[in-house]
Amino acid sequence: MNTFQMRDKLKERLSHLDVDFKFNREEETLRIYRTDNNKGITIKLNAIVAKYEDKKEKIVDEIVYYVDEAIAQMADKTLESISSSQIMPVIRATSFDKKTKQGVPFIYDEHTAETAVYYAVDLGKSYRLIDESMLEDLKLTEQQIREMSLFNVRKLSNSYTTDEVKGNIFYFINSNDGYDASRILNTAFLNEIEAQCQGEMLVAVPHQDVLIIADIRNKTGYDVMAHLTMEFFTKGLVPITSLSFGYKQGHLEPIFILGKNNKQKRDPNVIQRLEANRRKFDKDK
């Protein structure tokens, strides 16, 4: 399976939609957009082809479902009936688009040197990222959106599974509600896990649909965490970052792990970006 074959397969599977397609050969992307308002999404075909080797038609089914829901929610309609309980935060990489395809700025905040917080209207099976043009219809200010979203993410269930590897404890939050990574914003939940940790606590959001927390009690644990984050990062439909974060008393510090059985390393470049963010936050306060 190559990108051209995947392009054709997706176009065939999505032929029931009233959409047009635009293929970018250089970037190996396929833009799928509505014919009535030109709103749409762009899919990275090379990433899907890479996953196809392992997941076969399952990954195609996932993409088709995702596109179906996204295109349906992009229909022009009123937002006045949206309730405050539908405002949610979503985590994205700092490289994520800052504006819509129409050039309208999204509502977002910096989070760490590797992550940013965007805000969305929950629509059941999907959600719509909030941009500046939606504020008037929502009758909300940016600050109200921030407060509502944090309140709502704290109300989510934080059920998790655990696994022990070589004496290290790993917690997996994977409810597939679209907000697993968003739970990194629930400081009370993270503090609850921190109180149980006997070693160093690491947190990771490799993609949108998982939050990994680790109680690292020996050197092997760092290697396991590095492997887990990279594996999840490469398989996620909405990847965020392959880096882990050290967590202590409400503070997140991006780290990465070098070499087998080596303790975590603080990357000077990452720290420089993080410090730049901190200075900006302090200035804005």
UniProtKB/Swiss-Prot annotation:
A Pfam family that the UniProt record links to this protein: DUF1444
InterPro entries linked: DUF1444
UniProt-listed HAMAP family: UPF0354 (MF_01548)
Family, similarity comment: Belongs to the UPF0354 family.
Protein name: UPF0354 protein SACOL1793
